[in-house]
Amino acid sequence: MRSKFKDEHPFEKRKAEAERIRQKYNDRIPVICEKVEKSDIATIDKKKYLVPADLTVGQFVYVIRKRIKLSPEKAIFIFVDEVLPPTAALMSSIYEEHKDEDGFLYITYSGENTFGEAL
């Protein structure tokens, strides 16, 4: 999936911002979180997150659920490189394995399991 954030910001600017963030907050991970285009789930109010390195994927999903005010009975799926990351995985390990060349970790979310494969 193409990232709107990447389309709106040139590579050099994104790379410089990610480097600045990592230097200033070395215990945090710069994350861009965007909705899967054709999903019927609510659109998130902000795309950029500074996530604690020791946060789990499950805890990050909880943050996203709160930001989009998703009711408990509704499902949400997050994807990294179009694959479902393990809920117990630390965001720091997902970042190290899947960070973009610009230094950000790109995560997409959907109300449906649109890709359907676990990491």
From Swiss-Prot:
Protein keywords: Autophagy, Cytoplasmic vesicle, Lipoprotein, Membrane, Protein transport, Transport, Vacuole
Record note on modification: The C-terminal Glu-117, Ala-118 and Leu-119 residues of ATG8 are removed by ATG4 to expose Gly-116 at the C-terminus. This Gly-116 forms then a thioester bond with ATG7 (E1-like activating enzyme) before being transferred to ATG3 (the specific E2 conjugating enzyme), in order to be finally amidated with phosphatidylethanolamine. This lipid modification anchors ATG8 to membranes and can be reversed by ATG4, releasing soluble ATG8.
GO biological process, one term: protein transport
Main location, first listed in the record: membrane
Top-level taxon in the UniProt lineage: Eukaryota
InterPro entries: Atg8-like (IPR004241), Ubiquitin-like_domsf (IPR029071)
Traits of the deletion mutant: Leads to deficient autophagy. Impairs conidial germination under starvation conditions, conidial longevity, and ascospore maturation.
UniProt subcellular location: Cytoplasmic vesicle, Cvt vesicle membrane; Cytoplasmic vesicle, Autophagosome membrane; Vacuole membrane
Similarity annotation: Belongs to the ATG8 family.
Protein name: Autophagy-related protein 8
Organism (species): Cochliobolus heterostrophus (strain C5 / ATCC 48332 / race O)
Organism classification: Eukaryota, Fungi, Dikarya, Ascomycota, Pezizomycotina
